[in-house]
Each structure stands twice: as C-alpha cells, then as structure tokens.
Amino acid sequence: MPDINELLRWSIANSTAPDTDASEQLQIRFNPNSTQSGTSTLHASDSGPPDISPASTPGPVTPDDGSSLPLPPGTEVPVTKKEDLTTEMLDLILGKGDSITMKEKMAFATDENNSVEDRVEALDDFEMLIELIDNANNMPILKLWDPLLTLLSSSHPEIVAHTCWIIGTAIQNNIKAQAAFYIHETFSRILEIIYPPSSISSYPPSVRAKATYALSAALKHWPLASYALYTATSSAENGYSVLRRGVNDPQAIVRRKMAFLVGTLAMQSGERYEGEIPSEVRNYIEENEKNAPSESLVEGLKREGVFTALVDGLKQGVDDVEYEENAMRALVRAHQKGGLTVSEKSDLKTIWEKWGKQGRQERGLDGEDGKEVSETLSS
C-alpha cells in the first residue's frame, strides 16, 4: 500500500489540467489586476524608480497584454509521467468501506495461522465496527455470523471471550440482530460457556462474564425472552435453571451480572416491545409465538426458583455489596409484580432492616431508592 509521501507526489504530479503541456506549465503569465505600479513614491507627481522587480513580480514595465515570457534557449522541459489512481490510493484517501473491513477482520481472526494476539486485535477492531447498528445488521448479508460462531469453540479462552463480547455488542438493543442471533441457534451455546458440560473444563471468570453479557443482551427487550429461557437446553438445563445457578455463582463477577439480569427481566416482564419491528423479524416472532408458553418472565423465574435462590444468597451474606444491591433491587421488582411468596417477602424485609441506614448507604440504596424499597416491603 502506498505511504502518504507517495500519495502526495501523485497528487502533485496529477493536479494540472489535462490539456496543458509541460512547456506551458513552466511559462509565467502576468495579468495585473490594476494599472497601479508595483513601486511607490512619496508624492503623486514624483516619477517612480526604475523597474528592478523580478519577472515573477508585476512592475511598471511588466507586460500587461497577457503575453508569456518564454523559457531561455536550451532549457529542457521535464516530462512528468502521470499515474492512474489505484484502488490502494483510493483506500488511503477515503478509507475502505466498513463491509470490506469487517470481512477482512473476520477472515484474519478465524485464520489459526495468525497469532492469538493478532487475532484478538482483529476481533477488537471488528467489535468497534459493529457498534454501529447498520454494520451489526449487515452481518447476515455479509455471511459473518457463521464464521464468528465457530470461534466459540476455540481452544483459546481470549478468543472465546472476545467472540462473546462481539455477540453482546451486536445484539444489544437491536431486535434485528437479536433475531439473527436466535436464527443461528446461538442461545444454547452461550449457556454452555457459562456452565459447560461436565466433559468440558470450566472457562475463566473473564470468559464467563463476557458470555453472561451476551446472555443479557440476548434477553433484554426480546419479545420471546421467556420462550428462549424455557426451551433452550444446555447440559440438560434450560435458561431459567442457568439463571438460578448463576445468581449464587462462586465467581463474584458472574453472580453480580446474573443478579442484575434477573432484575432487568423482572422489570420487563409483561411489557410489550414498543419499538419498530422489521417485517422479517415480525414474521419470525409470530411463527415462534405459536409454540411459546403463556407464562410471563416473572412467572417463569418464580417457577424455576430463581427468586428463592436470590433470597438465599442474601441470607448467606457473601460480603459483596454490589451483588447485594443488585439482588435487592431484583427482588423488589419481582415483589412489585407478584413474584415473591409471603415467606420470601418476610425474609427480604428482615434483611433490609438488618442492614440499617449505614448498610443501605454502602449498597447504594439510600435516598429515593431506599424509600422505594421500604415502601414496597411494607405494602
């Protein structure tokens, strides 16, 4: 690819009009804009000094008829060879289109002959591109979902983590990309990264956290979230049971995200998607709704014991204020939608009172948020 100096040389060599030959380029024309001389005197009646201005500067005796000063005899006129503007030069000037760059980055990332570090860098670049919703929606057209999903089976944890990160970014708050995610049957594969089958070693916390991020993005605002959790199977577990395990996961980064996700699902339970739905996505949703259970998200979470597991986690006192904040918020939302039993509500109220003013402040639940919790648990 040409460097910037080569590009500048090309632009200079090709910047003249095509009908001007080299000799004309070196001739200098003078067209004074006024009859005013190029020198000045103290009084208007004084005569000006002799013209000693160079040829390039208009003076009193400079030709004013537009004639040219020819080159001295024997002067050789250099011939400039013009070059065609190449694709590489255009790429350097304008930059490659995102679609081309996305395909190149994915091809590089899936090539195992490249180093893991370089492949991860390519995935980083790809993730930045699909932050734009149009690029994320173009992934099916560019046939990039299939090669991306092959990376979920990589033996390198950092490759798997970045793949989950890309998936989460692509589908977050993007119903069209969410549909592509489910069409490619990716949901169960994400669950298996969070809780692999017994025959597969567990992934590091950083990988499982990225997979939980992708799980959250797949469910948030998705009209068929309850259906996805009910039907998806991973190691003989459905999505609801993965959430139940997740809220008490031994790894703090995972259980915090799981508790937050449960709160998000409780909040969106019973709500209808209000955004615009493309026709192809609407057709997919309507077709799958025929087989979907009638239960809401809160009903499914309650049936599977997810709320009970969260209450148990708070009762155990894991010394993790971020987790406890997320769990309390999730359970309050669940109670507001009828998701807690009388016993669970009583246990939650006891925990809330035990925290006291200082404990609530430590967990970010003072002020208006704390007032809402107190009122909800007292109702």
From Swiss-Prot:
Signal peptide residue numbers? none
Would the keyword Cytoplasm turn up in this protein's UniProt record? Answer: yes
- The primary location reported for this protein is cytoplasm
The Gene Ontology terms for molecular function here are:
adenyl-nucleotide exchange factor activity
Pfam families listed in its UniProt record: Fes1
Polar residues compositional bias, start-end:
29-44
Tell me which SUPFAM superfamilies the record gives: ARM repeat
Localization (cell): Cytoplasm
- Does the keyword DNA damage feature in the UniProt annotation? no
Which family is annotated? Answer: Belongs to the FES1 family.
Q: Which PANTHER family match?
A: HSP70-BINDING PROTEIN 1, PROTEIN FOLDING REGULATOR
What this chain does, per the entry, is described as: Functions as a nucleotide exchange factor (NEF) for Hsp70 chaperones which accelerates the release of ADP. Required for fully efficient Hsp70-mediated folding of proteins.
Q: What is this protein called?
A: Hsp70 nucleotide exchange factor FES1
Q: Which organism is it from?
A: Cryptococcus neoformans var. neoformans serotype D (strain JEC21 / ATCC MYA-565)
